[in-house]
Amino acid sequence: MCIRDRFRQINRFLEFIEDILPQLDKDKEQTIIDFGCGKSYLTFAMYYYLKVLKGYNIRIIGLDLKKDVIEHCNQLRTKYGYERLNFYEGDIASYKGVESVDMVVTLHACDTATDYALAKAVKWGAKVILSVPCCQHEANRTIADETLSPVMDYGILKERFAAIATDGARAKLLESKGYQTQILEFIDMEHTPKNLLIRAVKTGKPDAKAYEEVQNMSRVLNIDLTLKKLLED
């Protein structure tokens, strides 16, 4: 990805964060976790935007599976003096470094990694979830419906349909757990084909109908999503 496209992505993500600022308590330290932070362009930008520009009392934790990347990010945060920004090697499913989190962020967490991040966010009671999914392979492997053969018979259409069905189900499952959700265009397709963002804000009002809708769709399409199973545990 070129620098210009990455810059556009980060700016767009910060716009989504600006929209949810009223959900964050400015008088109390807010904990934010960025799962699959990679080289942490977004993580550093979030810290600067929220801590330096907006004056929020925040702690940001970046998690990634790559040891060398985490070491590099920690060197940078020391260089810039970002004391409440920390990076750890690991995955969100097994991370136990905090008891509660105010906001969970994922940018292109691949396939079911997004599901583990969303499930963890729900269990933490996160007030805000911002997730840009990536590579929804799970549903694509099992999805089937003879009435949709004009779509299913063509690989690229099946892949896109499976991705849309997966993200729609994820949004509905979050609603079933007491979140108000939106699926928004993250950035123009010109810059990345992975251009949908799931934004969820906690309301504390579970929607049982939303869960039933996912159940019905899963049965019709022959899919069994990881997020659904994780939230049932």
Tell me the role of every PLM-derived stretch:
Residues 59-64:
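Conserved SAM-binding motif I beta-strand of class I
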Residues 134-220:
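Substrate-binding/catalytic lobe of Class I Rossmann-like enzymes that use SAM or dcSAM, i.e.
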Residues 9-28:
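Conserved alpha-helix/loop element of class I SAM-dependent methyltransferases that forms part
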Residues 39-55:
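Conserved SAM-binding loop of SAM-dependent methyltransferases across substrates and taxa
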Residues 1-3:
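Conserved small/polar residues in nucleotide/adenosyl-binding loops
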Residues 88-158, 183-188:
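S-adenosylmethionine
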Residues 68-101:
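S-adenosyl-L-methionine
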Residues 28-38:
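Conserved class I S-adenosyl-L-methionine
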